[in-house]
């Protein structure tokens, strides 16, 4: 799809502000190459879409790629102020690697010298340096704030106790503390405390702006 190149991002001015080592403002974003991968449930041959044609008809659109690159590309190509509701469930930065089991025909053995059996694949690692995670989250939230409709847009951000206190301050900075609506507390599957001196983790939070 034909794409524009670059656009400037307005500085966020909400307060309070959270500071970390290496914090950088998101000043410009650029467009990344994209292509049609597949279309479903159509009666005619798919036409190669353009961003211009998608502006008024982009429901049921699944975008594959790094979220910052996808959001940047959409913004540069005219999707500012277009979205009414955003829900994100970002990594909680727990330091864990999440794997899936892949059953291989004919064997259940492990490869010699490997800690993980070869029928397990890492789906993603939930591990960032602290400053990298905070910068990643701020960049994503700034991009989303530019996509949300300024009059009717809402965003819901799900996070757990590991970083909820940091994310709340970043949300105040990006969306303004005055636009905070509520914190929704939701139950989660019970997680053993692992120590008599610790409490079980039973809830997560959704911040609504």
Annotated model-derived regions:
Residues 183-193:
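RNase H-like polynucleotidyl transferase catalytic core
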């Amino acid at each position: 799809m034909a794409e524009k190149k670059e656009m400037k991002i307005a500085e966020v001015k909400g307060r309070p502000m959270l500071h970390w080592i290496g914090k950088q403002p998101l000043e410009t974003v650029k467009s990344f190459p994209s292509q049609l991968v597949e279309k479903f449930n159509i009666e005619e041959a798919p036409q190669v879409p353009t961003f211009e044609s998608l502006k008024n008809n982009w429901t049921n659109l699944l975008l594959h790629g790094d979220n910052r690159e996808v959001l940047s590309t959409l913004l540069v190509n005219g999707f500012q102020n277009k979205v009414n509701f955003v829900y994100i469930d970002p990594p909680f930065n727990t330091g864990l690697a999440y794997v899936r089991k892949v059953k291989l025909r004919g064997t259940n053995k492990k490869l010699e010298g490997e800690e993980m059996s070869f029928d397990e694949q890492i789906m993603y690692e939930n591990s960032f340096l602290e400053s990298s995670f905070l910068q990643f989250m701020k960049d994503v939230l700034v991009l989303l704030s530019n996509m949300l409709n300024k009059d009717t847009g809402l965003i819901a951000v799900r996070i757990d106790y590991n970083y909820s206190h940091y994310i709340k301050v970043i949300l105040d900075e990006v969306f303004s503390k005055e636009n905070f609506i509520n914190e929704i507390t939701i139950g989660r599957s019970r997680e053993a405390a692992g120590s008599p001196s610790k409490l079980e983790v039973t809830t997560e939070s959704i911040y609504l702006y």
